[in-house]
């Protein structure tokens, strides 16, 4: 009788485990895709998803309709390099050494020997470690020397210019 009881319990445990496996797979959530659009000199209502009637932005309108819009975002600096460093690292510009100062050294122009310290962990590195494909299109402005470029920061693609339009 004792052997039957043990076998019965083992059988019940196997059945419960078999029933639980599909539930565990169903609980796995698919990772979302996302695109961060970071623009210089763009007013809140300058594009369609945020109310512009003066500029047609059909692709941005579609992305906003199918995705998620964030409406309370504040930059940490009024110039590009410090604010980009904050977006990429999650740190204040002063913390990463790219803050604007009275000498106007906040923006990293081509040929500048400074840049975002390679030891800083960026959002691209965190995402890449979690299986995301990462990349940047457009103005980098966090240093144009080889050690500062996003290709050395584990971004998979780079299509960047170092000039302003």
What kind of feature is each model-predicted range?
Residues 2-4, 10-19, 23-160:
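Formylglycine-dependent sulfatase
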